[in-house]
UniProtKB/Swiss-Prot annotation:
Transfers the 4'-phosphopantetheine moiety from coenzyme A to a Ser of acyl-carrier-protein. It comes from the Bacteria. Belongs to the P-Pant transferase superfamily. AcpS family. Pfam families: ACPS (PF01648). Its cofactor is Mg(2+). This is Holo-[acyl-carrier-protein] synthase. GO terms for cellular component: cytoplasm. It is found in: Cytoplasm.
Length: 126
C-alpha cells in the first residue's frame, strides 16, 4: 500500500459554539451526514461532537487534495466508531466516487480534543 494523502485540521470549539448560537442548526445540517445528525440531536456534548466531526471532514478533504468543492460536501464524509471505539470514515456520493477513482483501499483517522480545541488527522492509502 502507498500513502495517497495526509490531512490535518484543528478546530477551535468556541468558534463552532458561536456559529451554532448565531445560526442554530444550519451548520450541523450542512456538516453532518444523516446518521451523524441523529446522534447530534441527542448528544450530551453537541458542540464538541460537531467540532470533532468538522475537524475530521476538513482533514479528509485535505488528504484527498481537493478541499470541499467540485461536488464534494461535508456530509459525504461520515465519521463512525468501530466495535472498539476507533474512529472510522465512511464515504458517500462524490466523495466515494473520488475515492474509487483514486484507488483508495484504506483510510486512517485519528481524533483528539481538549478543552478548547478538536484536531484530526486522516491518511488515505491506495
Amino acid at each position: 500500500m502507498a500513502i495517497l494523502g495526509l490531512g490535518t485540521d484543528i478546530v477551535e470549539i468556541a468558534r463552532i459554539e458561536a456559529v451554532i448560537a448565531r445560526s442554530g442548526e444550519r451548520l450541523a445540517r450542512r456538516v453532518l451526514s444523516d446518521n451523524e445528525w441523529e446522534i447530534w440531536k441527542t448528544h450530551h456534548q453537541p458542540v464538541r461532537f460537531l467540532a470533532k466531526r468538522f475537524a475530521v471532514k476538513e482533514a479528509a478533504a485535505k488528504a484527498f487534495g481537493t478541499g470541499i468543492r467540485n461536488g464534494l460536501a461535508f456530509n459525504q464524509f461520515e465519521v463512525f466508531n468501530d466495535e472498539l471505539g476507533k474512529p472510522r470514515l465512511r464515504l458517500w456520493g462524490e466523495a466515494l466516487k473520488l475515492a474509487e477513482k483514486l484507488g483508495v483501499v484504506n483510510m486512517h483517522v485519528t481524533l483528539a480534543d481538549e478543552r478548547h480545541y478538536a484536531c484530526a488527522t486522516v491518511i488515505i492509502e491506495s
